[in-house]
Amino acid sequence: MSAEGQEELLDYSDSEEIAVPSNAPEAGADGADKDADKKGSYVGIHATGFRDFLLKPELLRAIGDCGFEHPSEVQQVCIPQSILGTDVLCQAKSGLGKTAVFVLSTLQQLDPVPGEITTLVICHTRELAYQIRNEYARFSKYMPDVKTEVFYGGIPIAKDIEKLKNKDTCPHIVVATPGRLHALVEEKAIRLNNVKSFVIDECDKVLEAIDMRRDVQDIFRNTPHQKQVMMFSATLSQEIRPVCKKFMQNPLEIYVDDEAKLTLHGLQQYYLKLDEKEKNRKLADLLDSLEFNQVIIFVKSTSRANELNKLLVASNFPSIAVHSAMPQEERIARYKSFKEFNKRICVSTDVFGRGIDIERINLAINYDLPNEADQYLHRVGRAGRFGTKGLAISFVGSKEDEEVLEKIQSRFDVKITEFPEEGVDSSTYMNT
């Protein structure tokens, strides 16, 4: 089976339909680590509080510790239905709190029994799985009996099997990539007969890849017929929606900014036309002249990531590279190092292009433009998340790049202007 390899590449009707207004606030309990004393400043349109959802006291206490007071618009629409066990299909742009919808909903419904797995969360990369596990840890901090484990390829499967067969270490919540989870099912090492919640995050990426979809179908068949199914993504094409709904029964469908505008709150977007040979000098100039907390620089291949990172380090820039060709443990260690602010600059392939939440990133640079417009959304969405400001700059070095830039502007009805010669005022993209 090659789904693990697919992850490595990473360039890989009676339902109720609700269109949430595109001016929804960009905050709420989402997937980034926030200091406990830092209060979320964005308020939902209806000023609903999390207490209105009648969540468990333990959950409300954890939400309060994170500094969240009001749910985002997506959370206001989804959570009241999802905590009742309704199937959910949700598409909303980055930073609107989709992760917290399924984390809070599944924890609300969870009644932990030793040795029984009741919640299954599938995602397409190891970093995202690791991050979701951390979200469960944050929101279940006052639920000491709840155990969550993450399973992904690149480490010996024997360790996973050992955890699963011991009632004391077997988790109630499993977060996993499709390849490793399918392997555990094939080995009969994991029992899914008690699963009550089946979640796929970034579901379009999981279900568009044929190998991953087959794995998910096999896993799905090993779970009970009666269960809740929830799927989430920042992009859901008209073609993939029917595929998602085949797993569901009369789902609540939420489409925010339905294939329309790229309106990432507070994100300034520019492009720079230059030749390939000019990219390194211009990048160094930008890193010297721009103010930023952390920056992520996207390139199109692992070899370019390594070479650019070497160049930056040699030029005394605090840089680190993260890409899918690295050994698994090193990749996770580098991700953690960047997230914990040990490095301010990260050079990455699209392994960081979807779902990864690092709150301090407020500058995203496309050293190489992506091939697809949707991938641009996921990349630049790393900056300006959670109601913060941000800046995105794309290098345009070829006719093909110009065509992609046109597609991005057309696809999302957004005007991306040329980066001014005099630069930009830091107050437009830096939080004061």
Curated annotation (Swiss-Prot):
The record places the motif (Q motif) at 48-76
One GO cellular component term noted in the UniProt record for this chain = spliceosomal complex
**Which residue intervals make up region (Disordered)?**
1-35
> What Gene Ontology terms for biological process does this UniProt record contain?
mRNA processing; mRNA transport; RNA splicing
* Organism domain of life: Eukaryota
Q: Which residues bind ATP?
A: 92-99
Q: Where in the cell is it found?
A: Nucleus
Disulfide pairings: none
Tell me the Gene3D superfamilies matching this sequence: P-loop containing nucleotide triphosphate hydrolases (3.40.50.300)
State the Gene Ontology terms under molecular function: ATP binding; ATP hydrolysis activity; RNA binding; RNA helicase activity
Q: EC annotation?
A: 3.6.4.13
Helicase C-terminal domain location is: 266-427
Acidic residues bias: where?
A: 1-17
Reactions catalysed: ATP + H2O = ADP + phosphate + H(+)
Q: Which UniProt keywords apply?
A: ATP-binding, Helicase, Hydrolase, mRNA processing, mRNA splicing, mRNA transport, Nucleotide-binding, Nucleus, RNA-binding, Spliceosome, Transport
In which residues does the motif DEAD box occur? 201-204
**Residue ranges constituting the Helicase ATP-binding domain according to the UniProt record:** 79-254
Q: What does this protein do?
A: ATP-binding RNA helicase involved in transcription elongation and required for the export of mRNA out of the nucleus. SUB2 also plays a role in pre-mRNA splicing and spliceosome assembly. May be involved in rDNA and telomeric silencing, and maintenance of genome integrity.
Q: What is known of its domains?
A: The Q motif is unique to and characteristic of the DEAD box family of RNA helicases and controls ATP binding and hydrolysis.
Q: Give the family per the record.
A: Belongs to the DEAD box helicase family. DECD subfamily.
Q: Per its record, how is this protein called by name?
A: ATP-dependent RNA helicase SUB2
Q: Give the encoding gene's name.
A: SUB2
